[in-house]
Amino acid sequence: MNNSKTKKLVMASLLAALCCVATMIIKIPSPLKGYLNLGDCVVLLSGWLLSPAYGFAVAGVGSALADIFSGYVTYAPATFVIKGLMALIAYYGFKILGNKIGNLPSRIISGIVAEIVMVLGYFVFEGFLYGFIPSIVNIPANAVQGVAGIIIGTILIKVFEKSKIMME
């Protein structure tokens, strides 16, 4: 492995661990056995900082491990897919829009689209588990988590850019 591949693998591993920890540190139970957390900011960061494959893996693995370690094993497979898709959306949204409207607006827009996918993804997943009518109660909580993820992720990416850490 060359230095560049090693660096990418180390960055991805660190971000996956950070995603897991950020998801587990502050857990606010939601009405239907899930929980609110701060992991979405790392999910978005992984999409904005890494390649699509690494971003998907970081977001999916880090978030799913947090579910497993926290006793939400039933959620882990859905979390892997939903959070991985969020990172892909953040990546491609940023890449497509970045040159057209600038970095900050493209990150905000890609973050909003990614978080909408998260809210809808968990609504559908919980709809199959608990019924679609009861699953509606988690939509506002997931939306709040999404807004927090966008705000914190946008702040952190600016810090990373200024310090030149974790940039490919």
List the predicted regions and their residue ranges:
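Loop-helix junctions at membrane interfaces
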Residues: M1-E168
